[in-house]
Amino acid sequence: HSTGEVKALVGGRGDKSGNRTWNRATDTCRQPGSTFKIIGCYAAALDAGGKTLASVQDDAPFTVGSKTFNNYDKSFGGFTSIRWAITKSINIVTVKTLQDIGVELGYKYAEDFGISTLTDSDKNLSLALGGLTKGVTNLELTGAYATIANGGVYLEPKFYTQVLDHDGKVLLDKTETQDSRTVIKDTTAWLLTDAMKDVLTQGTGKLARFDSQIAQAGKSGTTTSNRDCLWAGYTPYYTCVVWGGYDDNSKQSGKLTSYPKNIWKNAMSRIHEGLETKDFVQPDGITNATVCSKSGLLPLGGICDNDPRGSMLTTEYF
């Protein structure tokens, strides 16, 4: 992700049947599910929406107009922080956060991340959950996550640096024309990454974690009836997004939802063999403080630390 170079791309399974055949990584648009929570909501919320990882929403039944939003397990957790909502992929908190910061802001950030398939009809609260008109390509979703891994700087995915003829003359050159732009602050990127590290240790991505001291972060995603199952993850070295589903959009059984995580785990484990142990570098400007987990604010003495359910104090990065 530090160069934008595409090291490997798989457009389908099975034996190759020809050249320039349908490539599901570049040609197919599919619904990204909860992987889009980071791209269409939380990145904007932390970067420009006045939210922090400690900010809370009331995870409770929520209806806007005729649309009722639910969590995937149909349960509700009350006042919940953004960090925990990312870790456990809680829909209600995400939708309420996008409502707070404004759909237009989330939409703009998603475009800045390199998502080119958005339409005006996507300017609604379903954007927070990846409910898109056309969907996204795996390549562009990978580029978006690589932006976070790269400290907030988007680099256009490139498949070559130069193409030369037999005389050494340059025919195609990507060394000077690669699109590059800052999408989010490096501090925002680090905070998102820190939250997504929890996804692999405490949340919906435990199955994706490979056995290594190299830092890993990521986000899961599924759509209705498991028609799309995704795992978007990265390390300080590489970003990889895996999608699984049927071309005809058929339902998948629940047991198949783990396949993208297992594929990511096995592939990334091999790719990182022999690489130096590395963590994501914390940029200047990051600090931490003790807050009340039920308000996201500085605690009041004798209240947050005296809850009958136990102390509500927690330490968070800002």
Residue ranges and their predicted role:
Residues 2-3, 28-36, 74-78, 82, ...:
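Secondary-structure capping and boundary motifs in well-ordered enzyme cores
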Residues 4, 31-57, 85, 144-148, ...:
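Active-site SXXK
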Residues 6-9, 55-56, 84, 94-97, ...:
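Structural recognition of the beta-strand scaffold that forms the well-ordered cores
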Residues 6-10, 15-28, 135-317:
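A penicillin-recognizing enzyme superfamily signal
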Residues 22, 36, 46-64, 101-105, ...:
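Short, well-structured active-site flanking segments
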Residues 41-50, 62, 87-91, 99-103, ...:
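Sec-exported extracytoplasmic/periplasmic mature domains
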Residues 50-106, 124, 166-198:
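Conserved catalytic neighborhood of penicillin-recognizing serine enzymes
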Residues 68-70, 102-143:
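Mid-domain, small-residue-enriched loop/turn segments at the edges of structured enzyme/sensor domains
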